[in-house]
Amino acid sequence: MWKLASIVLATAAVCAAADPDLTGIWSPSRATGPGAPAPPTPIVVKPAYKATFDGLTAKIREASARGEQYATKGLCSPYGMPTMLQVAVYPMEVLQSPQQVTLIGEAFSEVRRIYMGKKQLPLDDIAPGYYGHSVGLWDGDTLVVDTIGIKESVQGYSNLPHSDQMHITERIRRVSADRLDDQVTIEDPVTLEKPVVYTLVYRLLKDYQMVEFVCDNNREYIDENNIVRMKMGSQK
């Protein structure tokens, strides 16, 4: 009897100490009413970047009003961080182990790795890339992720300009069985007057299987005005 009780208590202790489980396939969603996250903070860029940012924002809005898509990246280029975190309706799969949390975006089959329990590398030791270098640790039920080393050509959140000094901090938490929140803070001492903070909300897709997404550049092209067009049957 006492032996059984000891086993039960030991098992309970292990379970209590286990890291929160973020695994699953998560679809971008919205939360309204009670429990909804705070709205995004305004984007305030430094004067040297304001004209470029405002001009690009205007072109995107004008194209959208015409029902068109203004190209902000190459057709087959990945979105990279932080845009890959929420691309239209495309879901994201989270795989988790004690050593690494892996995020797989269905759009462009993007893969991002978060190395757990590691110290962040010096920026000079990181080869700039689409996803940068991410390290994570647990703060209670929240995964705190630190990311640097994203190259300047990568599309930014809401197309904000960024330098190689951009620093992204995330606080990822499973709010309920079927909801995941990711609070994102973007800092850049070169391009931003103040940090940009926003929260992404995801819903669990219980019976979904990720679909292969390969960009072969056969259906679309970018015209001379930077608008994404569909190729006609006779075009190559």
Regions found by a protein language model. Give the residues of each.
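Hydrophobic h-region of N-terminal signal peptides that target proteins for export
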Residues: 8-17
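PEST-like low-complexity, intrinsically disordered acidic/proline/serine-rich tracts
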Residues: 17-236
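Bacterial N-terminal signal peptides that target proteins for export
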Residues: 1-7
